Amino acid sequence: MAVQQNKKSRSRRDMRRSHDALTTAAVSVDKTTGETHLRHHVTADGYYRGRKVINK
């Protein structure tokens, strides 16, 4: 089993963890339907930037 040679300080540990924070997803509201969706993604009913791009 691997064992560290020297103890890592709180500062080094926290600097490593500084990139682990999660960000909230950018959500938009569709112009035509008012439905919320992820930015740069098609809505569930097939609209993207006010245009119907997928026919169901």
Swiss-Prot record:
From its record, what is one biological process in GO terms? translation
Origin, by domain of life? Bacteria
One Pfam annotation reads Ribosomal_L32p
**A Gene Ontology CC term for this entry?**
large ribosomal subunit
Q: InterPro entries this protein is in?
A: Ribosomal_bL32, Ribosomal_bL32_bact, Ribosomal_zn-bd
Bias-annotated ranges (Basic residues):
7-16
Q: Which UniProt keywords apply?
A: Ribonucleoprotein, Ribosomal protein
Q: Which family does it belong to?
A: Belongs to the bacterial ribosomal protein bL32 family.
Q: Report what the protein is called.
A: Large ribosomal subunit protein bL32
The organism of origin for this protein: Haemophilus ducreyi (strain 35000HP / ATCC 700724)
